[in-house]
UniProtKB/Swiss-Prot annotation:
BP term (GO), one: bacterial-type flagellum-dependent cell motility
Free-text domain note: The N-terminal domain is involved in FliG binding, the C-terminal domain is involved in FliM binding.
GO cellular component, one term: bacterial-type flagellum basal body
InterPro entries per the UniProt record, alphabetical: PilZ_domain, Split_barrel_FMN-bd, T3SS_YcgR, T3SS_YcgR_PilZN
Organism: Escherichia coli (strain K12)
Keyword Nucleotide-binding: yes
Effect seen on changing residue 223 to W: Significant suppression of the pdeH disruption motility phenotype
Resulting phenotype, residue 42 to D: Suppression of the pdeH disruption motility phenotype
Protein's name according to its UniProt entry: Flagellar brake protein YcgR
Function: Acts as a flagellar brake, regulating swimming and swarming in a bis-(3'-5') cyclic diguanylic acid (c-di-GMP)-dependent manner. When bound to c-di-GMP it binds to elements of the flagellar motor (MotA and/or FliG and FliM, binding to FliM also occurs in the absence of c-di-GMP), causing the motor to slow down. Thus, increasing levels of c-di-GMP lead to decreased motility. Probably binds 1 c-di-GMP dimer per subunit.
Gene: ycgR
Subunit organization: Monomer. Interacts with MotA in the flagellar basal bodies. In another study it was not seen to interact with MotA, but instead with FliM and FliG, also in the flagellar basal body.
Free-text disruption phenotype from the record: No visible motility phenotype. Disruption of this gene suppresses the reduced motility of a pdeH disruption, thus the double disruption is motile.
Effect of residue 223 to P: Significant suppression of the pdeH disruption motility phenotype, no binding to FliM
Keywords (A to Z) from UniProt: Bacterial flagellum, c-di-GMP, Nucleotide-binding
């Protein structure tokens, strides 16, 4: 997660505690990962100087994590991904049941997801995508916008009759120029229309596709994050030049 943009790093103690309290209140599952293992837990209690975590379901994992150092804790909420590291866990009790305790982290990553960050793809050069339909024909389209959770695309031809919302596609090829070629499993969430007025004051209607990415690996997610912020920076620089 250190590869994410620094704006996602929470360093204020009150902000860190606020995120942790939200995880506790919503009973969000936590994944504890260390060198050689992982387990699923949840926050049982939180104070400014103590975190109480539930024991995992497997005794051998609980024993192993107590011996581990530099434990990474991650959580997935509807709007964000949370990740932080603690140096070590100690065994304790909570409500007369075994539990882990540790001190709250000084910082944590709070990476906001799809509905918060969506960046338009550049018009020049355009980024093109392609995938296969059920009849083995090739469907080509242009990347319109991009987020960690999915992408929007524009068809340059009429919508094929067999293209329906809810369809899943394996390994859609997305050519993002200087960033390289990526392949995503994705589900078609919606089909709509993009309408613009051209220079002749005529309405141009283009089929618009919205995809949700499936099974994106952490490595690819980090690459997407870097691309999104680079595109955002380039767009901001162009806007500044126009204003100047």
């Amino acid at each position: 997660m250190s590869h994410y943009h620094e704006q996602f790093l929470k360093q204020n103690p009150l902000a860190v505690l606020g995120v942790l309290r939200d995880l506790h209140k919503a009973a969000i599952p936590l994944r504890l990962s260390w060198n050689g293992g992982q387990l699923i837990s949840k926050l049982l209690a939180i104070t400014p100087d103590k975190l109480v975590l539930d024991f995992g379901s497997q005794a051998e994992d609980n024993i192993a994590v107590l011996k581990a150092q530099h434990i990474t804790i991650t959580a997935e909420t509807q709007g964000a991904k949370v990740e932080f590291t603690v140096e070590q866990l100690q065994q304790s009790e909570y409500l007369q049941l075994p539990a882990f305790i540790t001190v709250p982290p000084p910082t944590l990553w709070f990476v906001q997801r799809r509905r918060y960050f969506r960046i338009s793809a550049p018009l020049h050069p355009p980024y093109f995508c392609q995938t296969k339909l059920a009849d083995n024909s090739t469907l080509r389209f242009r990347l319109y916008d991009l987020s960690l959770g999915g992408m929007g695309a524009l068809l340059e031809t009429a919508k094929p009759a067999e293209l329906q919302e809810g369809m899943r596609f394996a390994q859609i090829e997305v050519n993002m120029g200087q960033w390289g070629v990526f392949h995503f499993d994705a589900q078609l969430i919606s089909i709509s229309e993009r309408k613009v007025i051209d220079g002749k004051n005529e309405t141009i209607t283009t089929p618009r596709l919205s995809f949700r990415f499936l099974n994106v690996s952490p490595t690819v997610e980090r690459q997407l994050q870097r691309i999104i912020f680079s595109l955002e920076r380039e767009a901001r620089e162009k806007a500044d030049k126009v204003r100047d």
